[in-house]
Amino acid sequence: MAAPVSEPTVARQKLLALLGQVQTYVFQIELLRRCDPHIGRGNAPPTEAERASGAGAAASSEAGPGGPAGAFLTPLSVTLELLLEYAWREGERLLGSLETFATAGDVAVFFTETMGLARPCPYHQRVRLDTYGGTVHMELCFLHDVENFLKQLNYCHLITPSRGATALERVREFMVGAVGSGLIVPPELSDPSHPCAVCFEELCVTANQGATIAAAWRTVSVTTSPSRRRCGWTPTSVRRYLPHAAGLSDADRAGALRVGPCAGPDRGGRRAAPPVAENDSVRKEADALLEAHDVFQATTPGLYAISELRFWLASGDRAGQTTMDAFASNLTALARELQQETAAVAVELALFGRRAEHFDRAFGSHLAALDMVDALIIGGQATSPDDQIEALIRACYDHHLTTPLLRRLVSPEQCDEEALRRVLARMGAGAGGPKGGAGPDDDGDRVAVEEGARGLGAPGGGGEDEAPSPRARGTGPETWGDIATQAAADVRERRRLYADRLTKRSLASLGRCVREQRGELEKMLRVSVHGEVLPATFAAVANGFAARALLAALTAGAGTVIDNRSAPGVFDAHRFMRASLLRHQVDPALLPSITHRFFELVNGPLFDHSTHSFAQPPNTALYYSVENVGLLPHLKEELARFIMGAGGSGADWAVSEFQRFYCFDGISGITPTQRAAWRYIRELIIATTLFASVYRCGELELRRPDCSRPTSEGRYRYPPGVYLTYDSDCPLVAIVESAPDGCIGPRSVVVYDRDVFSILYSVLQHLAPRLPDGGHDGPP
């Protein structure tokens, strides 16, 4: 019997099913925006009740970044929420445009409204972030702008008040149009030269050949968010999908199947060019010699050389393509769009008796007036992005390989033809030699075969057919004529070797350039698909701010709430605890552990590698946090040594005044405020460490507000400890007692404070009855 499926799994499956349905609805909206408005008007519009229910569903998704009642967000819930709001908003706009078209009847006006041609670019969103160090203004224009802002907010979360969550609402508004429009990323939103956090994490685990992360980061191209996909079109799509189209009669369907691209083979495909016969007389002569030979005859080296050269010429696909064939192939590719349009019109006439006025047809004159680059980016109905990329690369190669040197290297059959001609000439000159014996030019035949097999010609000019010099044969004394002949041969050989090396280097440079440009073309032309990186990043940061508000709301309903912020007599407790702790210093053996605690508290909610199944230390998560925002090296060094620099000795670590812990009055600027927050957090860590050491009450846990995750019942458990809220109004919350299940309820005891030492004294008062010695004396 199979194990029962858990409730979270069932809920996730239902959300995925709903997400698929909403994605389909959004896709239909995008199609109707581009289709003939008569088609949209042909269907009955939704009733007012249906439209009201859609508005209610969208309104329920507008509870803000934290969701309804601060619900815990997931990438799936964020994506579904964005899709619902986009579907409702664009659906209402489309219905309004269809109603306007029913009155005016202007197709151009309909497409201008639905496609937003008269509206400004919707992908510009101003964002304002209020921090304790000042106000930051930014503009979101691209997807990487959203991710960068979320990572920066994650880094600055400890100096951002709870109202900083309002900035996430502006981010969400941008994501509704950018991510909620479906799986396909609008081309104007994606910039592959800005990698995401996942790309950086992958970069950190790959070999870098000694390069710094900053240097390697500049060469990374984004492949995860968004990711690029191959897509194509086949002329058999109509034949495959038309039989399943609803609302059509069998006669109309059969008539449509007899026309269009489904009526025959792909006429837009490339036609293989027939092999081109060159040097027919040489090949015929060689074939005649080979046909006259049989196994009962002795094989001469020259005949064997001819056979070997014919083998090299016959092996492989070396069929050339004439200029006219290439021109005809290009014309066929250019005509593919026209053929597709003609076939589509034929199918429409067969099915509906009229030619539909879609967006690309209504604005055909505008599309035809675009320049080559814009037309390349827009693409076509019958040409996939990969077809465009291959055509551009093929045209580039065809242009550059017209150079004789490159053509000779990439067309080795020319070398084989020349070698075959030389062998035949030598055999004709030595025809009077003894049959079956080795003629005087056997070495020359062997050299010719080797040159032909290697594709090595003599591009330097004439002289290739000359016999080896007497010095090369090692016969006879040298004469001035022999020396001149040898010098000329050496010049030709050096020229050949230089040309060969130059050709190979040029071809390698061309290949390297084409590979780089191919990558750029893939970035520009291939279809990009949204991943889960952006919704996951938004959910993590939003959950961090929602956790602050949730902790404040839950602790306010505890059974016992002690507010030291306005209680009398707290100053004496502050003086007593401060004086008792400053007399001690932290054990050096504890510095590594409290350093990791410091890294855990200053890190944001986005990078939580320390909570994974295969947990990593907190310094790893903080490393990803600071590297993704481009923190300068000197600040990273300062942050790494922040705890070690204090060491818990002396009074330098106690930086806050009474009831002014986490107070940033008089400090301006992000970096100075961030440094002040680090000092406050260091003070809290050292004070709690000394408190546990001096009073021997066990380790006092320091926790973040987002340390708790909802259970399957939606409840949050907060273990006892001191919670740093990052809110200057109430930065410290101590839960000294809670219910047995860990939830905050009537039995819980909570302490609010703005002072480290007074809240520690309150904790000591609560723990004193449990201590073996009853605790130390209180303040005088």
Swiss-Prot record:
Top-level taxonomic group: Viruses
Composition bias, Gly residues: 429-439
Pfam families according to UniProt: PRTP
Binding site for ATP: 691-698
Residue ranges of the region described as Disordered: 41-66, 428-447, 452-483
Primary localization class, coarse: host cell
Biased composition range(s): Low complexity: 52-63
Molecular functions per Gene Ontology: ATP binding; metal ion binding
GO biological process: viral DNA genome packaging
Sorted UniProt keywords: ATP-binding, Host nucleus, Late protein, Metal-binding, Nucleotide-binding, Viral genome packaging, Viral release from host cell
The family this protein is said to belong to: Belongs to the herpesviridae TRM1 protein family.
Cited function: Component of the molecular motor that translocates viral genomic DNA in empty capsid during DNA packaging. Forms a tripartite terminase complex together with TRM2 and TRM3 in the host cytoplasm. Once the complex reaches the host nucleus, it interacts with the capsid portal vertex. This portal forms a ring in which genomic DNA is translocated into the capsid. TRM1 carries an endonuclease activity that plays an important role for the cleavage of concatemeric viral DNA into unit length genomes.
Cited HAMAP family: HSV_TRM1
UniProt protein name: Tripartite terminase subunit 1
Organism: Human herpesvirus 1 (strain F) (HHV-1)
